[in-house]
A protein has these predicted regions:
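Luminal/periplasmic active-site loops of membrane-embedded glycosylation enzymes
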Residues: 155-162, 172, 266-280, 295
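Long extracytoplasmic/lumenal interhelical loops at the membrane interface
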Residues: 274-338
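Hydrophobic transmembrane helix bundles of membrane-integrated enzymes that assemble
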Residues: 1-264, 320-413
Length: 414
């Protein structure tokens, strides 16, 4: 790879600091042995420290559009804290505590300042992808004793409603990012070891029994693998559709993973056919049309509610009485928190990253951003720390290594 040799490998000290920063951002994987409140305190401290360290880089004037978009997303997020104070009476401190995880994006400016080598970044991606698998297996071995993952009430709960033990905690996006990296490396280097790793990562993704993550990961995989052969691409799409249709005629045990997930999907489709609006459509309509108090909050956002404030209790009441959840609608949450300004910035970032030209060796960064563009429709993945760090790495790689756009070239994803 012929890249500008401005990048350097992380030193041992930097590796220690970056791993600590990541684990803190992940809130120690919400380990059940720690107090739910205490594990959040380091996050509130490390974000400002990272911000101060990167301040000169943050205010640096550059014409790079990706850099500018990341900067303005951070600015719009900070503005939303004050919006919640002015229009909802939520204190600045509670506003910051509610949205601190959303400021993990400042990691991008550390990367831009330090310019670590691609080798360091890819090693980092593999480390946290593998670490999630190890922790997940450990949590499985301890079932039914809960190990990782607090719910919104500060309690740990495993779900067995989908045909197998469903243990989900922060780090799933790190797993998906590592999968895309493995897949990309296999198709570039043709080393079977990366194919084996990619298959293992995908099996772990399936074992998360989260339909949307499986769907969008598989879709991006199909597009990437068959991008150069349109016939195979179309056949693959037809195969996926046929598999979905056959799912209604093939009988699976209701206790099996496949049977349970098909049943859940069919129940949702049945509700739609009976005239019952899909819950996420209802949520999107509500949060886009009924949440904001005035035109100003429509533009700059309302900020993120904290459970201890009256603003947060308003959201809790909505969840309990109408079963409408802000975390269910990624773009709805972006609009509520940062308004039309933030929504425009995020969409511009996602779309630009999906259309940008990248070297074949770094295509995993683009694969992840395409995945995120679609996955964020039905969940607020963009606001999760693991997703934000993966975003930072992907956008950083695109900022530094993007190829020049070709004139009169047909637009393609890969």
């Amino acid at each position: 790879m012929l890249y500008n040799r401005i990048e350097k490998d992380w030193t041992r000290k930097e590796w220690v600091l970056i791993i600590i920063y990541t684990v803190i951002s992940f809130q120690f994987y919400l380990y059940a042995g720690f107090n739910n409140t205490i594990i959040k305190l380091p996050v509130f401290l490390t974000i400002p420290i990272m911000f101060v360290f990167c301040w000169k880089t943050f205010i640096n004037h550059t014409n790079n559009k990706l850099f500018q978009l990341m900067k303005w997303i951070i600015i719009s997020t900070v503005i939303s804290i004050f919006s919640a104070y002015v229009f909802w009476g939520q204190s600045i401190i509670l506003g910051y505590r509610a949205i601190a995880t959303g400021l993990t994006l400042v990691f991008y400016f550390y990367l831009y300042k330090r310019k670590p080598s691609i080798n360091s970044l890819e090693t980092y991606i593999f480390i946290f992808g593998i670490l999630y698998c190890v922790l997940w297996l450990y949590a499985m071995s301890k079932f039914p004793v809960p190990v990782f993952g607090f719910n919104e009430d500060g309690e740990v709960k495993e779900d067995i409603s989908r045909g197998m033990i469903r243990i989900n905690f922060i780090g799933r996006i790190s797993l998906i990012f590592a999968y895309f990296l493995s897949l990309n490396k296999y198709y570039v280097q043709k080393k079977k070891v990366y194919l084996v790793i990619a298959i293992l990562f995908f099996l772990f993704i399936v074992m998360q029994v989260t339909r949307q993550l499986i769907l969008w990961t598989a879709l991006v995989t199909v597009i990437y693998v068959f991008q150069k052969n349109r016939k195979l691409l179309y056949l693959s799409i037809v195969f996926v559709i046929s598999l979905f249709l056959l799912g209604k005629t093939i009988t699976f045990s209701q206790d099996s993973v496949i049977g349970t997930m098909i049943t859940l999907t069919e129940e949702q489709m049945s509700n739609n056919q009976q005239g019952n609006e899909d819950i996420r459509v209802t949520e999107y309509r509500y949060f886009f049309t009924e949440w904001s108090r005035n035109i100003i909050t429509d533009i700059i956002g309302n900020g993120l509610p904290h459970g201890s404030s009256s603003y947060g209790k308003y959201l809790t009441k909505l969840q309990e009485q109408q079963k409408l959840y802000l975390s269910d609608v990624g773009y709805g949450q972006i609009f509520v928190v940062t308004g039309w300004m933030g929504l425009f910035l995020y969409l511009m970032l996602f779309i630009k990253c999906c259309l940008i030209r990248m070297p074949e060796e770094l295509m995993y960064a683009k694969m992840f951003m395409i995945f995120l563009l679609f996955a964020n429709i039905a969940a607020s993945w963009h606001a999760k720390a693991d997703c934000q760090i993966a975003m930072c790495i992907s956008v950083y790689l695109m900022t530094i290594y993007a190829l020049p756009q070709l004139k009169h070239k047909k637009i393609t994803l890969f």
